[in-house]
């Protein structure tokens, strides 16, 4: 039952990842996934059936208690790679939540929450959005995050099949200075920050096996290792020195590794 609950929770994460969400979405599901101490979970939902207005109550109660994990593992499908803008493996996209962070994340109330960004301003005509980045943010290699990196990431994402549709109205992404990004759109787009929950990578690295990000972990072939110089002064929500990556080439491999508890989340 516990592992079914983990899978259901992972599916919730999947929906966020498909939209590009990372940090805030990750925060919400992680808090539910890793409770402190023994805990039982009960959930109740009310919804319509077959589109009708009649609502039926659906109850699901998990009676098993469990404790926090002593180790953590993820499924890894190496054939799909870890390029955040083109990777089509949903399991690999879970890994991105540990490697990368966005300019903004979308909250449960559908508001843009600054992550790597500090603030933003939209002109009266809605066609220019200026984003001010946080200072002191660094990539895994120790280099500082700049507006040029953010512009490169947005341009790379806009040219990809995965993110191209959502970013199609952006006509230019330019660094005004080291911490100021200016985005122009072909039409009024006052809510553009809601679409900027995409992974930010270091400029010029999109074709690398695992482009440097700003997240709490970095890729090390068979595992993720904690970034010792992570720019935040708080511990990550998934707080392990290492996260094992178990090669799972096929859907059957993913299923088996999950059932045998080699990995803790699958999609």
Describe the residue ranges of each PLM region:
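N-terminal lobe/hinge region of extracytoplasmic solute-binding protein
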Residues: 73-124, 155
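Short, well-ordered beta-strand elements
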Residues: 60-78, 128-131, 150-153, 181-183, ...
